[in-house]
Amino acid sequence: GFLWVTGGDRHRGICPQDNSLLCGVVLRVDGNGNAHPDNNAPRADKRIYTYGHRNVQGIDFDPATGRAYTAEHGPWHNDEVTALVNGGNGGWDPAEKRGGRTACPDKYCGYEPNQKDGMIPAIRAAYTPMSDTRFTDLMKPAWNNNGYSQGTGSAAFLTGSNWGIYEGRLAAGIMGIAFGGTPGGLRIDMYDIDADGQSIKSVVHMPLGMEKRFRGLRMDNGMLYAST
């Protein structure tokens, strides 16, 4: 078996797209910390499986295919669920003076333009996109949060016949960050993802009868454990 490790961009603008830095990445390593021999990211560090990430909070594996899926925080827009591709690029590039941007505080454009009540999410998202289509190796997200960032957390595939029509769906906890005109949304979402991992058929809010910041999800013997 191999260990998968997710890492954020550390508020360094050049990190996610830089070829030499170990941040904004997903690693696949063995028990000694060595790279999986099939890792294919175009990086100097062969432990890297994918790069170009902002803040991956959840990762789990489709029980039918073994494919890895991540749940990731957006900055102030577009939380995402993405099917990982070996060597693929998440498309996050918060560096200044790229993509038509000028200088940014701390040389980090991830929070620009600044959060403002009533700002149209699409306008904010266009300035520093979560999945920038400039990159030819972009991994297209299966789902984004309609332009909002509400704090997508841990993720787990639902397994067991007791889940009925929801068996095989990916569940993700939403921590409900509500400010600057963003709706709250403390919940667990269940995504019915297309077989190609490029889109979803539907998303359903799990009827829990309560609102909590769901930080961790884990499946065990057909039961979903959720930590708050």
Regions from the language model: what does each represent?
Residues 4, 9-204, 222, 227:
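Beta-propeller domain segments
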Residues 213-215:
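Repeated scaffold domains used in trafficking and secretory/extracellular systems
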Residues 205-209:
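Short loop/turn motifs that cap or connect beta-strands within the blades
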